């Protein structure tokens, strides 16, 4: 049976999805609060930059993969307007439910769908923009997921991947202390769940760095791939186009 990683652990591929699901079932209720605490609110700026780069126009069809609590979908729905189509999706039912309810509370009505990024249930050449924010690192077969995202893009459509990445070397020691000491402490004290935030830190370290992910996107068939380092490389936004 094939092995993969769950944080720093080596696990069977079929077990990873269940373990990741357990993490997000656990954190869903406190997800927005913990994002604010862990990033000092910076996650909002990272997402705003992604929204600006997506450049969604009226009438666009947009797929928000691993959409979580709906920050991107909310913005895209307003930009695409009544003539557009924005799908808020997540593989985790708890996260999708929290996101759907949050969007409805904000007066945003957009379809919500349980969706495995490795088996996207849409036809070829359907979307103008596909986004995945802080979700790719949790996927078992990132290459398959990236190829699927490209498949559902229209020609000239763009994929945007916002994800934790490799921090600049001068900050590495401080970042390690924050990741492996402070994050689990925050998880324990504010969400009663140190383990899920230990996994968060480990999953970030196991995720491909900026150049590796750029190569993976190119190998998936995307062109003109570039990336933007945000907050000294704590996060990177990769953008690629389907031609």
Curated annotation (Swiss-Prot):
InterPro entries: SAM-dependent_MTases_sf, UbiE/COQ5_MeTrFase, UbiE/COQ5_MeTrFase_CS
GO MF, one annotated term: 2-methoxy-6-polyprenyl-1,4-benzoquinol methyltransferase activity
Organism per entry: Paraburkholderia xenovorans (strain LB400)
Protein function: Methyltransferase required for the conversion of demethylmenaquinol (DMKH2) to menaquinol (MKH2) and the conversion of 2-polyprenyl-6-methoxy-1,4-benzoquinol (DDMQH2) to 2-polyprenyl-3-methyl-6-methoxy-1,4-benzoquinol (DMQH2).
EC numbers for this chain: 2.1.1.163, 2.1.1.201
Residues that hold S-adenosyl-L-methionine according to the record: 69, 90, 116-117
Name used for this protein in its record: Ubiquinone/menaquinone biosynthesis C-methyltransferase UbiE
Recorded family membership: Belongs to the class I-like SAM-binding methyltransferase superfamily. MenG/UbiE family.
Pathway(s) it belongs to: Quinol/quinone metabolism; menaquinone biosynthesis; menaquinol from 1,4-dihydroxy-2-naphthoate: step 2/2; Cofactor biosynthesis; ubiquinone biosynthesis
Keyword field contains Transferase: yes
Catalysed reactions, semicolon-separated: a 2-demethylmenaquinol + S-adenosyl-L-methionine = a menaquinol + S-adenosyl-L-homocysteine + H(+); a 2-methoxy-6-(all-trans-polyprenyl)benzene-1,4-diol + S-adenosyl-L-methionine = a 5-methoxy-2-methyl-3-(all-trans-polyprenyl)benzene-1,4-diol + S-adenosyl-L-homocysteine + H(+)
Record-level GO BP terms: aerobic respiration; menaquinone biosynthetic process; methylation
Pfam families in the record: Ubie_methyltran
Gene: ubiE
Keywords: Menaquinone biosynthesis, Methyltransferase, S-adenosyl-L-methionine, Transferase, Ubiquinone biosynthesis
Endpoints of the signal sequence: none
UniProt xrefs under NCBIfam families: MenG_MenH_UbiE (TIGR01934), PRK00216.1-1 (NF001240)
């Amino acid at each position: 049976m094939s092995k993969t990683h769950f944080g720093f652990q080596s696990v069977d591929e079929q077990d990873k999805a269940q373990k990741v699901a357990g993490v997000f079932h656990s954190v869903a209720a406190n997800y927005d609060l913990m994002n604010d605490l862990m990033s000092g609110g910076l996650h909002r700026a990272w997402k705003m930059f992604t929204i600006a780069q997506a450049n969604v126009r009226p009438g666009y069809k947009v797929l928000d993969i691993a959409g979580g609590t709906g920050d991107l979908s909310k913005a895209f729905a307003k930009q695409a307007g009544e003539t557009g189509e924005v799908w808020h999706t997540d593989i985790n039912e708890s996260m999708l439910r929290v996101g759907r309810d949050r969007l409805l509370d904000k007066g945003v009505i957009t379809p919500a769908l349980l969706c495995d990024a490795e088996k996207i249930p849409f036809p070829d050449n359907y979307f103008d923009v596909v986004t995945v924010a802080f979700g790719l690192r949790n996927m078992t077969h990132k290459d398959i997921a990236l190829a699927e995202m490209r498949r559902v893009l229209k020609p000239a459509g763009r994929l945007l991947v916002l994800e934790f990445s490799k921090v600049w070397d001068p900050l590495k020691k401080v970042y390690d202390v924050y990741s492996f000491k402070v994050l689990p402490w925050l998880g324990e004290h504010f969400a009663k769940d140190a383990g899920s935030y230990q996994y968060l830190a480990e999953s970030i370290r196991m995720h491909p760095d900026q150049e590796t992910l750029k190569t993976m996107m190119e190998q998936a068939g995307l062109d003109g791939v570039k990336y933007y380092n945000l907050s000294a490389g704590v996060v990177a936004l990769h953008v690629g186009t389907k031609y």
